[in-house]
């Protein structure tokens, strides 16, 4: 084990107004799901994404579920989802009684392969869920074109992509709606929390109604529909607003970290493949994701263990949905790239608090364990 301080794979940066805003919630006793910070956070986030509406939720998974329900996704429907994603993307579809249909990914960006969408569409297909994996927006033009041609809804899973851009537009502004996560390891955090963005007035109103148990906003304790308790607390929103105030600083700090990786990984030669950045926009690098080169005697999982012994935390790329028990029945022969990325993909420490010396340690450790 290393005697040096441990380098975490992710860490929140809480050096703005977070403490002052949380104390205001406590001093005013507005600690639950009503308060000024919820209103201000929603408005500020909508403005940041360039959309009309932002609906705060208690986490990113409930944001996905709420959006799908509001869009009318239900039993018998199909939603196309990448196999290589965090399981919440597929689970949210399953919660609705609908069926996730899995699409393979691009080997360079890790995002879904838009060229493979058309073959998966059936009369039951109702929506496409492009997941902006690890901070880079999917190639949205062909996805939106397929959706228009087949009259399908598009919900962006932008959990990992706050601040990312595609052809001059921010994540959250490209589909019919989009969802975000503010878990503690995300680009901005509320501890736990989520957000939905949309330009659709009716959809926003329905999501707000469903979020608060379905209570009529003009008639207290009258419930015209069955809803959910997916509300964010004022304390969560207070942290989120403080985080959003400094998001540009957070992203700039991440870009410095990425620059160090890009420069220093040359030392490792073909033992790793660096992430591909598309020319269509800004990659915000929620995670700096590499693939291990061919011909190594070690494995990705062994590399993670060896790095851990040297005081450096890393993470595997997400396991594809179709190799895990809940979704193994959805496996097809056309998900091979997702499988390969799931075997050799590795997420290195990526957060705004890292120093150049930290990255030097990571590179030196990789040089030692990649054999």
Swiss-Prot record:
Disruption phenotype: Mutant produces altered S-LPS. Its cofactor is pyridoxal 5'-phosphate. GO terms for molecular function: GDP-4-dehydro-6-deoxy-D-mannose-4-aminotransferase activity; pyridoxal phosphate binding. Transmembrane segments: none annotated. InterPro entries: DegT/StrS_aminotransferase (IPR000653), PyrdxlP-dep_Trfase (IPR015424), PyrdxlP-dep_Trfase_major (IPR015421), PyrdxlP-dep_Trfase_small (IPR015422). Pathway: Bacterial outer membrane biogenesis; LPS O-antigen biosynthesis. It comes from the Bacteria. Gene3D superfamilies: Aspartate Aminotransferase, domain 1, Type I PLP-dependent aspartate aminotransferase-like (Major domain). It catalyses: GDP-alpha-D-perosamine + 2-oxoglutarate = GDP-4-dehydro-alpha-D-rhamnose + L-glutamate. Keywords: Aminotransferase, Lipopolysaccharide biosynthesis, Pyridoxal phosphate, Transferase. The modification N6-(pyridoxal phosphate)lysine is found at residue 186. Catalyzes the synthesis of GDP-perosamine from GDP-4-keto-6-deoxy-D-mannose and L-glutamate. Can use only L-glutamate as amino donor. In vitro, can also use GDP-4-keto-3,6-dideoxymannose to produce GDP-3-deoxyperosamine. Involved in the formation of S-LPS, which is required for attachment of the protein S-layer to the outer membrane surface. Homodimer. Belongs to the DegT/DnrJ/EryC1 family. This is GDP-perosamine synthase.
């Amino acid at each position: 084990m290393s005697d040096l301080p441990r380098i975490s794979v992710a860490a929140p940066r809480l050096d703005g107004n977070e403490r002052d805003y949380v104390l205001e919630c406590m001093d005013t006793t507005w600690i639950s799901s009503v308060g000024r910070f919820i209103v201000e956070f929603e408005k500020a986030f909508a403005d940041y994404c360039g959309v009309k509406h932002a609906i705060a939720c208690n986490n990113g998974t409930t944001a996905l579920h709420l959006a799908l329900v509001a869009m009318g996704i239900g039993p018998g429907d199909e939603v196309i989802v990448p196999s290589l994603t965090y399981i919440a993307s597929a689970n949210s579809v399953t919660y609705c009684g609908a069926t996730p249909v899995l699409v393979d990914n691009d080997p360079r960006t890790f995002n879904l392969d838009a060229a493979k969408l058309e073959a998966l569409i059936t009369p039951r297909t109702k929506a496409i869920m492009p997941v902006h994996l690890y901070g880079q927006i999917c190639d949205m033009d062909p996805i939106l074109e397929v959706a228009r041609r087949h009259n399908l809804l598009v919900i962006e899973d932008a959990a990992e992509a706050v601040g990312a851009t595609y052809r001059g537009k921010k994540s959250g502004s490209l589909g019919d709606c989009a969802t975000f996560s503010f878990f503690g390891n995300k680009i901005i955090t509320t501890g736990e929390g989520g957000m939905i963005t949309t330009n659709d007035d009716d959809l926003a109103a329905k999501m707000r109604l469903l979020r608060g148990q379905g209570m009529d906003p003009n008639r207290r304790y009258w419930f015209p529909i069955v809803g959910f308790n997916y509300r964010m607390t004022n304390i969560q929103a207070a942290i989120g607003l403080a985080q959003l105030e400094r998001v540009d600083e957070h992203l700039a700090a991440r870009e410095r970290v990425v620059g160090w990786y890009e420069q220093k990984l040359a030392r490792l030669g073909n033992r790793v493949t660096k992430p591909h950045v598309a020319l269509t926009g800004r990659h915000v690098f929620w995670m700096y994701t590499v693939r291990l080169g061919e011909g190594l005697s070690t494995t990705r999982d062994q590399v993670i263990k060896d790095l851990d012994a040297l005081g450096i935390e890393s993470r595997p790329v997400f396991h594809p949905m179709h190799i895990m028990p809940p979704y193994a029945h959805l496996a097809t022969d056309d998900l091979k790239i997702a499988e390969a990325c799931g075997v050799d993909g590795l997420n290195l420490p990526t957060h705004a608090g890292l120093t150049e010396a930290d990255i030097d340690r990571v590179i030196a450790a990789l040089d030692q364990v990649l054999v």
